[in-house]
Structures are given as C-alpha cells and as structure tokens.
Swiss-Prot record:
BP GO terms, sorted: tetrahydrobiopterin biosynthetic process
The protein, known as: Putative pterin-4-alpha-carbinolamine dehydratase
Keywords: Lyase
Tagged with keyword Electron transport: no
Highest taxon in the source lineage: Bacteria
InterPro entries, alphabetized: PCD_sf (IPR036428), Pterin_deHydtase (IPR001533)
Catalytic class of the enzyme: lyase
EC number: 4.2.1.96
Protein family: Belongs to the pterin-4-alpha-carbinolamine dehydratase family.
Organism placement in taxonomy: Bacteria, Pseudomonadati, Pseudomonadota, Betaproteobacteria, Nitrosomonadales
Reactions listed under catalytic activity: (4aS,6R)-4a-hydroxy-L-erythro-5,6,7,8-tetrahydrobiopterin = (6R)-L-erythro-6,7-dihydrobiopterin + H2O
CDD domains referenced in this protein's UniProt entry, alphabetically: PCD_DCoH_subfamily_a
C-alpha cells in the first residue's frame, strides 16, 4: 500500500483539462494515505491546521507557498491568527486529481519531525 512518504515523493503532472477527475473511490483510497485531519467534500480535500501563534501560522503559510511553487499546484488557503485551512482541488478538471493528494502529502511532511 502506498503511504504518505510515497505520495510526498511524487511530482505533480501538468493538468490542463481533458482528464476526468478522480472517482470517489479513488479519492477515498488516496485520502487514507494522508495524515488524519484531511476531509473529502464537494470535489476537494481540506484540512485545518492549528498553531500556537500568528508567527507560526504565517511560517506554515509561507512553507505551503514554497511547496505550491515547486509543484505548480496551488491550494486555496484561509488564514486566521492561529489557524490555516488548506483546500485542494484541480480547477482545470472540475474535481480532484492525484496532484491534490501529492501536494497534501507534501504539506503534511512540513509538520512531521
């Protein structure tokens, strides 16, 4: 079975549409390979991360931005004082792709020591 390290080691593939989104069963199987806390709903995956303070929250946001730039796959993020909600979907196909799970795994790896 693939695990978070396997997903995090993969590279996102360019996606410009014309590819069907993942089926629900495929998305559920990939979701099991991520850290707990990720939720699947409305053709997207999301997770809320909590921190001690604003500085730690913003450091996390900047780290996610770096991952996004490296993979050329960008999440929606909602940022508060000590929380950040990260949501992935692949807009070009109107649903989830493997890229969303690859990036989610890379985000999880930011917090694993």
């Amino acid at each position: 079975m693939t695990n978070i390290c396997d997903l995090a080691d993969r590279k996102c593939k360019p996606c410009e549409g014309g590819v069907p989104p993942l089926r629900k069963e495929e998305a559920e199987n990939l979701l099991k390979q991520l850290e707990q806390g990720w939720q699947l709903a409305d053709n997207r995956i999301s997770r809320t991360f909590s921190f001690k303070n604003y500085y730690q929250t913003m450091a996390f946001v900047n780290a996610v931005a770096w991952v996004s730039h490296q993979e050329d796959h960008h999440p929606d993020m909602m940022v508060g004082y000590n929380q950040c909600r990260v949501e992935y979907t692949t807009h070009a196909i109107g649903g989830l792709s493997e890229n969303d799970f690859i990036c989610a795994a890379k985000v999880d790896m930011l917090l694993i020591s």
